[in-house]
UniProtKB/Swiss-Prot annotation:
One of its GO terms (cellular component) is cytosol. It holds the Pfam family UPF0149. This is UPF0149 protein Xfasm12_0965. Belongs to the UPF0149 family. The lineage of its organism: Bacteria, Pseudomonadati, Pseudomonadota, Gammaproteobacteria, Lysobacterales. NCBIfam families: PRK04758.1, ygfB_yecA. Gene3D superfamilies: YgfB uncharacterised protein family UPF0149, PF03695.
């Protein structure tokens, strides 16, 4: 049996999304969900309808891939060992596809975060800076970069790690508060 904190595979998320008639990619869905949860929003079965802005969308069935995606994401965000991971492109994807998935994930994260945190007016200085950084990534495209596989692969991994930690910091800001001391080590 899979660990409750293990994210489903990208292909499984996309297949189930298509079966449900959803026009959303796995990175977009996970980014929106992560933003919603990081901002302290929707702790229940209506999460999918909320992030898709469609009240007609049914909640994912119990035990489904999308329900497991929700459970794993929520568990990872709460994990004291900072287990949160981004659901991006498959491992075999090209650098350009991976970068595009990351930019798409960031766009979706900001949308989900905005849904949850719209009433919160105060973030820490770090939280404000993180949102600005994520907005820059959300506006980026692979056309903005020289996609040299050898040189850029490590850089993309560093950006992915920055985004991962940034989400945890924003989650702490929203659920613990901007004035509480936060330590990641």
């Amino acid at each position: 049996m899979e660990s409750p904190m293990h994210l489903p595979e990208v292909i499984a998320v996309e297949q189930e999304s298509q079966q449900m008639g959803l026009s959303v990619t796995a990175p977009e869905l996970h980014g929106s969900l992560s933003g919603l949860l990081a901002g302290g929003g929707c702790n229940g079965p209506d999460w999918l309808a909320m992030i898709l802005a469609d009240a007609e969308v049914a909640a994912p069935p119990k035990g489904s891939v999308l329900e497991r995606l929700y459970q794993a994401t929520a568990s990872q965000l709460e994990d004291p060992d900072f287990a949160f991971q981004l659901l991006l492109a498959d491992d075999g994807a090209t650098l350009a596809a991976r970068a595009d998935a990351l930019f798409e994930w960031c766009r979706a994260f900001l949308g989900g975060f905005g849904l949850a945190a719209h009433s919160r007016s105060v973030l820490s200085a770090e939280g404000d800076e993180i949102l600005r950084d994520l907005a820059k990534l959300a506006q980026a495209s692979v056309d903005d970069f020289d996609m040299n596989e050898d040189k850029e692969d490590g850089s993309l991994e560093e950006i992915e790690e920055y985004v991962r930690v940034a989400v945890l910091l924003l989650h702490g800001d929203c659920l613990i508060g901007p004035c509480a001391p936060q330590r990641l080590n």
